[in-house]
Swiss-Prot record:
Entry keyword Magnesium: no
A GO molecular function held by the record: proton-transporting ATP synthase activity, rotational mechanism
Gene Ontology CC terms, in alphabetical order: proton-transporting two-sector ATPase complex, catalytic domain
Record keyword Transport present: yes
CDD domains in the cross-refs: ATP-synt_Fo_b
Assigned keywords, A-Z: ATP synthesis, Hydrogen ion transport, Ion transport, Transport
Task performed by this protein: Produces ATP from ADP in the presence of a proton gradient across the membrane.
Gene3D superfamilies: ATP synthase, E subunit, C-terminal, F1F0 ATP synthase subunit B, membrane domain
GO biological process, one term: proton motive force-driven plasma membrane ATP synthesis
Family to which this protein belongs: Belongs to the V-ATPase E subunit family.
Organism listed in the record: Clostridium botulinum (strain 657 / Type Ba4)
Record-given protein name: V-type proton ATPase subunit E
Amino acid sequence: MSNLENLTSKIIEDANKEAEKLLSEAKKEENKIVDEKIKKANKAKEQIIERAKRESRTKAERVISNAHLKVRNNKLEAKQEMINKVFDKAVIKLQNLSKDEYLNFVKSSILSLDIEGDEEIIVSPNDKDKIDISLMLTLNNQLKAKGKKALLKISNENRNIKGGFILYKNGIEINNSFEALVDSLRDELEQEIIEALFS
């Protein structure tokens, strides 16, 4: 299994663990948000229904239908907020990796990529101090052993990413930022999280 597959498996496993861990909290939060939105919508619906009865039966049916739609939309919006929180917490968990875990992530990710070996590594300002000369020597030595150029270097450019890194060369980027990795798994994991949170 490649390092990228290991990383992907770890991220999926961590996201699943995080989803389970947050399930109780998320369920309470979801119920609170949904209940508040439903109460507001029901209150508005009752006022609208009362007014509609005075105007006409046909109009009342249309208004009731719109009120139900609004309640449904509010509930969907509340669920989407909870799903977003799960993915945001996954990124935060990755941001809280220890220095060693972060360096291992960078090393294994870069060495699993098919690169030429003369790219620049762009990191967030918060991670600049984590990348040390030892890591760069290790990376370049291992790239050289694979027959690649051993000219990998840290870019002077900073990016507004939450963690991870971006490899850059000649206008081409390989985005391994934490948010990009979590987003790339979102389609795969979203249905599982929906089932875990709302079933």
